[in-house]
């Protein structure tokens, strides 16, 4: 009878993995059932732990990736860049040799490739001139002030920013003389006599534009600017025009601000300061084909000017998302007129924020034919081609 009972129980309940033993006591049967149930619970628990661990790990990795993407977008949006002055951490410190501006590091220019950018308000940078050169800018800007009977030209954005030691000589002329002298050495292997290697070792023929923005009376200040440039002129390092022929040199000086155009033109045989022409006045309809004919000589041309510049915000207007067709037509007409006269186009006071809009405007200007970017953010302007 026990055999029939065993078979009947086996057919009714096969939920347990352990074979039913008819000879076990009731307590032993309960203990066996509890062990089987515990085994199943352990298996479920291990599976739950594995599933939860996988989900938590995947969530953590996803959040980490998401944070990295958001961080990159924020850096791009806000224009967070590396500091180009980081190599000058010892500048001006005791024992560095820079206390009196007697030492200038030229080694940092050996691997620098020139980039068509202009360092706007360059004197605001931690290391004027050198910060711009380090990233490859081919133009720097200095605002100069003349006071009373002094012959010194002080450099700064306004009167409150001027100091006795920040002058055109100390910040620009003397450092440029030192850099170019080192790039034109007198050695048994190289005779620097009559050579004109510029500041960039990778492109020694590239001229550096020194844009001098005269802030005080032009008629009184311009003669002092000419006098302050004598160390460069005496070494034949200033681009000049003589008898109608332009001679390119390592430094090209351009006068802007209150620079008097009529005074620059007084010497018809020799000039080594060029004018920053008013770009807005050079507009020509971009939709009219250029026949190449010109019945009258241009007032502003390559013999007296280099740049043709304008305040972007005033000449073109505000930009919200993209440049309008009307704004593009203005830009094309101004660029057409400047290039027809052999001048380089420079827009200043372009929108600086948000960075996405700024970059789009930079790209559009260069695509339309602008020759140089007028920038405050050196790293962003030189990290890619526009």
Regions found by a protein language model. Name each.
Residues 128, 138, 334:
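Aromatic/hydrophobic pocket-lining residues that form π-stacking "cages" and hydrophobic walls in ligand
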Residues 124-127, 237-239:
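Short alpha-helical segments and helix-capping/turn motifs at coil-helix boundaries
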Residues 133-134, 366:
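Non-catalytic positions within long, well-ordered alpha-helices that form the structural scaffold/packing
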Residues 139-151:
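Short acidic, Gly/Ser-rich segments with clustered Asp/Glu that frequently serve as metal-coordination loops
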Residues 1-114, 149-386:
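Catalytic cores of phosphodiester-bond hydrolases, prominently lipid phosphodiesterases
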Residues 118-123:
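Asp/Glu-centered strand-loop micro-motifs enriched in Gly/Pro and often flanked by an aromatic residue
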């Amino acid at each position: 009878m026990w055999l029939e009972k065993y078979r009947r129980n086996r057919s009714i309940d096969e939920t347990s993995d352990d074979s039913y033993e008819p000879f076990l006591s009731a307590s032993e049967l309960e203990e066996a059932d509890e062990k089987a149930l515990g085994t199943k619970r352990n298996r479920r628990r291990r599976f739950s732990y594995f599933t939860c661990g996988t989900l938590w790990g995947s969530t953590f990795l996803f959040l980490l990736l998401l944070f990295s993407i958001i961080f990159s977008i924020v850096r791009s949006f806000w224009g967070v860049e590396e500091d180009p002055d980081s190599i000058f951490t010892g500048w001006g410190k005791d024992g560095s040799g820079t206390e009196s501006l007697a030492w200038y590091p030229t080694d940092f220019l050996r691997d620098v490739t020139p980039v068509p950018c202009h360092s706007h308000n360059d004197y605001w940078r931690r290391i004027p001139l050198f910060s711009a050169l380090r990233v490859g800018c081919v133009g720097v800007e200095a605002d100069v002030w003349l006071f009373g009977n002094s012959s010194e030209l002080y450099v700064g954005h306004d009167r409150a920013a001027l100091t006795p030691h920040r002058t055109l000589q100390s910040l620009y002329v003397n450092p440029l003389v030192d850099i170019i002298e080192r790039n034109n050495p007198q050695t048994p292997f190289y005779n620097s006599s009559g050579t004109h290697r510029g500041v960039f070792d990778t492109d020694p023929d590239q001229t550096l534009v020194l844009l001098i923005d005269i802030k005080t009376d032009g008629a009184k200040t311009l003669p002092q600017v000419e006098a302050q440039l004598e160390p460069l002129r005496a070494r034949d390092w200033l681009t000049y025009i003589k008898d109608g022929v332009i001679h390119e040199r390592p430094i090209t000086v351009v006068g802007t601000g209150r620079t008097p155009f009529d005074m620059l033109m007084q010497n018809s045989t020799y000039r080594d300061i060029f004018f920053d022409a008013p770009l807005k006045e050079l507009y020509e309809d971009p939709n009219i084909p250029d026949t190449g004919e010109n019945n009258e000589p241009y007032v502003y041309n390559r013999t007296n000017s280099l740049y043709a510049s304008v305040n972007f915000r005033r000449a073109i207007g505000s930009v919200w998302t993209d440049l309008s067709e009307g704004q593009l037509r203005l830009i094309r007409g101004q660029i057409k007129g400047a290039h027809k006269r052999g001048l380089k186009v420079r827009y200043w006071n372009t929108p600086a924020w948000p960075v996405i809009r700024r970059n789009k405007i930079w790209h559009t200007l260069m695509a339309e034919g602008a020759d140089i970017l007028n920038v405050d953010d050196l790293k962003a302007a030189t990290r890619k081609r526009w």
